A protein has these predicted regions:
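Flexible, gly/proline-biased loop segments at the beginnings
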Residues: 51-60, 71, 84-87
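Extended, compositionally biased flexible segments
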Residues: 74-79, 87
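Glycan-recognition surfaces in beta-rich domains, encompassing non-catalytic CBMs
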Residues: 298
Length: 298
């Protein structure tokens, strides 16, 4: 069968051998996939998803039952108090920008404990000068670099214990850096360390590329809020655009009022026909993520 595509027998034999060697790892990925698929299915059942939720709204988008149901489902699946899931988010970077501008005020300090975030956030934060950056509004930025792909726990504890940090950002994915992605056990460890000296700092996870990779999401480990893109994992390759912010209710409210307007928040936002694709994408996402992981490991 493969010969007509120019694939040699020795390549096929090697691939079969590698597949056998990787079976234990693939089995673990399949277990995660099954668990996350059941989470999604349970949420769909809980909120009685039907074709009525595929309906489209235009204009202001008041009373969009599908949109509100999608946000309830995301909250259920991600373990969040509330969620903001919108096609009005252009990208993960846009959602992160909305979150940062929602949570931070002039003279607040943001601390990244994974070194410098994505390049696309350079001008958002003010690492690269921009008149619309957080820096231009008086928000201060600090970073603590990783050590051998792990957190610098001592330096983090020392800095956070001074109680003048408003928000800590953890970028789960490697992004454009050469480091490894941050595993959940390390995220759990650093959150516990932070909470041992500071109960009030906002811990925000950039969860892009991290959803459904493991059995739980960072909110279950003590993070306050997380942000991700529907163009990536949770969109399942089907959602045409959008992103989400999920976590504590008061933080999601702030983010919603930054995306729309104070006093409007989550009440508005036309979906213009994407509800069906977001729901389909989420339903398929555990399988799509599992396949992606297997391909990357292979």
């Amino acid at each position: 069968m493969y010969k007509e595509f120019g694939i040699k027998e020795e390549v096929i034999s090697l691939a079969e051998k590698i597949n056998k060697d990787l079976l234990p790892i693939f089995d673990e990925i399949d277990k995660n996939c099954e668990l996350n698929s059941l989470k999604v299915l349970k949420a769909f059942n809980k909120y009685n998803v039907s074709d009525m939720h595929f309906n489209s709204t235009t204009g202001y988008g008041y009373g969009d039952v599908g949109r509100d149901t999608i946000e309830n489902i995301f909250s259920e699946v991600l373990g969040a108090e509330d969620s903001l899931v919108r096609g009005q988010f252009i990208s993960g970077t846009h959602a992160l920008t909305v979150a940062l501008f929602a949570f931070l005020r002039p003279n607040d300090t943001m601390l990244s404990i994974c070194g410098k975030p994505y390049d696309t956030l350079d001008e958002v934060i003010g690492i690269v000068d921009n008149d619309s950056s957080l820096k231009s509004y008086g928000v201060k930025y600090e970073q603590i670099d990783l050590i051998n792909d792990d957190f610098d726990y001592d330096k983090i504890i020392d800095r956070v214990s001074k109680n003048d940090i408003k928000l800590i950002e953890i970028q789960r994915s490697r992004g454009y850096a050469l480091r490894r992605s941050i595993t959940l056990d390390k995220i759990e460890k650093v959150i516990k360390a932070i909470r041992s000296v500071n109960k009030n700092v906002i811990i925000m996870i950039d969860n892009c590329y991290g959803e459904f990779v493991d059995k739980v999401e960072p909110l279950a480990l003590g993070a306050d809020v997380m942000v991700g893109s529907l163009i990536k994992n949770l969109g399942g390759g089907i959602a045409p655009n959008g992103a989400y912010i999920a976590g504590k209710k008061e933080l999601v409210k702030l983010a919603a009022e930054r995306l729309t307007a104070p006093g409007l928040g989550k009440e508005v936002g036309p979906t213009m026909g994407i509800n069906k694709y977001i729901l389909q994408g989420l339903f398929m996402a555990p399988s799509v993520v599992a396949s992606s992981l297997k391909t990357a490991i292979f």
